[in-house]
């Protein structure tokens, strides 16, 4: 069974939409929506393991230009 998580992203001012578009192209990302509030983009992602999820966030998501901070929240039950 795959692991599902939400990744909450803060971006540089005015970069939410472009970050969401770029993150949506990453393998394992189900949705990437630009939103209002303390976070600018909320991502729903899946991976085979916690290790794979961490690698995706660190090696792919966090490399997108305009991201200043991420918070990964694994789903407990789905």
Regions found by a protein language model. Give the residues of each.
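A compositional/biophysical signature of low hydrophobicity enriched in polar/charged and small residues
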Residues: 1-78
